[in-house]
């Protein structure tokens, strides 16, 4: 068995032919640059590109296959220059009868299966070239379609206040999905504003593995959350086994941001912008008295929880708080570039490179910042209302 760093939720901004795929997303994010960034800079060994429903993205992937840069693996997924495995995914929006919208991810093994899925979904999605579009279907129906295509189905950023399963659609999985279809869900993506400790307070989620992914819309965001997975090889089939914890394949560890860094962790007044915990405010802003509140993930999970804090299934992987390197005070772009060029990828810097080497190349302040990442000593200023939290070094 081998261990790999994996980020299964990365977006393409624009195709090489100049067509926008995901708006708003950096135009620097093409299929090719995602793979190059993962390989040369990030050290992420498995990437999920979740815009492969788009024919423009399929065209770019096919071009790389024709060039010999991507090679189809025997278990599905494509190997890029023998260093990064590409898993094809599709983020799709659904809508419940009451108006709540949800984003979900469907992963498939190769271009042929993704093209088949895309052709079917084009009957529901008006512009199949753009990613994350509304399929004008309820969550249950998309689960059924994905299951018919043998896709790995994952609810995305499951608790965020906008366009997520528990954030805007339902109070329970059972209310939108019959028991017979529960096994069609391969895993649940936590999102940047939640962690394992929070999600495990909801008992019906104990049957599922959790994914911590970046949902990257720009190159520097790749790997801001990631997973360490145990696989025989970095193929689609092996990932499918790990998602379901079968045959000794598994998610070994989740590396996610402290939820307080997420931009939807706390409540936010939609009128004055105050970020605050719910407390006993009854939905009224304690600052301006406004009654329109964006409910944060922390409060939402508190509403759904049926278990006390600190309870977990015995097989739940460890969750490690990770600070994305661009968020570290005193670690500017030029300093990080120098560290990567001289000492290795970001994964190597975070997990392997001695602090003495970091200090030698970038100075004492940078070494202190990396020390804070590794031992969790940084102070966090909570985010909310669409604004990320901040890291404060002692």
Task: Walk through the language-model features, giving the residues of each.
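Short, flexible loop segments at the rims of nucleotide/cofactor-binding pockets, characterized by
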Residues: 22-27, 129-133, 187-191
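Active-site environment of divalent metal-dependent phosphoester hydrolases
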Residues: 13-15, 49-58, 95, 160-164, ...
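Hydrophobic faces of well-ordered beta-strands that scaffold small-molecule active sites
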Residues: 6-10, 47-48, 86-90, 153-155, ...
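Extended substrate/RNA-proximal surfaces in nucleic-acid metabolism proteins
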Residues: 58-186
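C-terminal functional module detector
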Residues: 1-4, 15, 54-56, 63-67, ...
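An N-terminally biased module of ancient metal coordination in phosphate/nucleic-acid-related enzymes
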Residues: 1-99, 356, 373, 377-379, ...
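Extended hydrophobic/aromatic segments used for targeting, binding, or gating
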Residues: 179, 194-198, 350, 368-369
């Amino acid at each position: 068995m081998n261990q790999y760093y994996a980020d299964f939720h990365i977006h393409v901004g624009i195709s090489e032919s100049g067509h926008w795929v995901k708006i708003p997303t950096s135009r620097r994010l093409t299929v090719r640059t995602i793979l190059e960034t993962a390989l040369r800079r990030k050290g992420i060994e498995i990437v999920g590109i979740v815009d492969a429903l788009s024919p423009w993205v399929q065209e770019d992937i096919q071009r790389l296959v024709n060039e010999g840069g991507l090679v189809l693996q025997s278990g599905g997924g494509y190997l890029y220059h023998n260093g990064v495995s590409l898993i094809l995914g599709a983020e799709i929006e659904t809508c419940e009868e009451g108006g709540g919208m949800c984003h979900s991810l469907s992963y498939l093994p190769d271009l042929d299966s993704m093209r088949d899925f895309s052709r079917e979904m084009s009957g529901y999605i008006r512009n199949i070239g753009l990613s994350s579009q509304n399929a004008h279907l309820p969550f249950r129906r998309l689960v059924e379609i994905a299951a018919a295509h043998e896709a790995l189905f994952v609810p995305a950023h499951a608790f965020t206040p906008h366009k997520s399963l528990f954030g805007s659609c339902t109070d329970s999985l059972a209310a939108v999905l019959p028991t017979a279809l529960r096994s069609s869900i391969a895993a649940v993506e936590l999102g940047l504003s939640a962690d394992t400790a929070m999600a495990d307070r909801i008992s019906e989620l104990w049957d599922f593995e959790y994914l911590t992914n970046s949902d990257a819309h720009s190159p520097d965001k790749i790997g801001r959350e990631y997973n360490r997975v145990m696989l025989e090889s970095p193929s689609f089939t092996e990932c499918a086994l790990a998602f379901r914890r079968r045959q000794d394949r598994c998610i070994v560890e989740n590396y996610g941001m402290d939820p307080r860094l997420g931009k939807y962790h706390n409540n936010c007044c939609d009128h004055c912008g105050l970020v605050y915990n719910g407390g006993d405010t009854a939905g009224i802003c304690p600052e301006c008295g406004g009654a329109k509140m964006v409910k944060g993930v922390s409060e939402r999970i508190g509403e759904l929880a049926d278990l006390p804090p600190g309870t977990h299934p015995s097989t739940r992987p460890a969750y490690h708080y990770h600070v994305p390197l661009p968020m570290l005070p005193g670690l500017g772009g030029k300093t990080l570039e120098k560290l990567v060029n001289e000492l290795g990828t970001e994964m190597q810097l975070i997990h392997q490179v001695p602090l003495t080497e970091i200090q030698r190349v970038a100075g004492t302040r940078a070494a202190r910042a990396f020390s804070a990442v590794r031992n969790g000593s940084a102070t966090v200023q909570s985010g909310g209302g669409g604004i990320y939290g901040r890291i404060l070094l002692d």
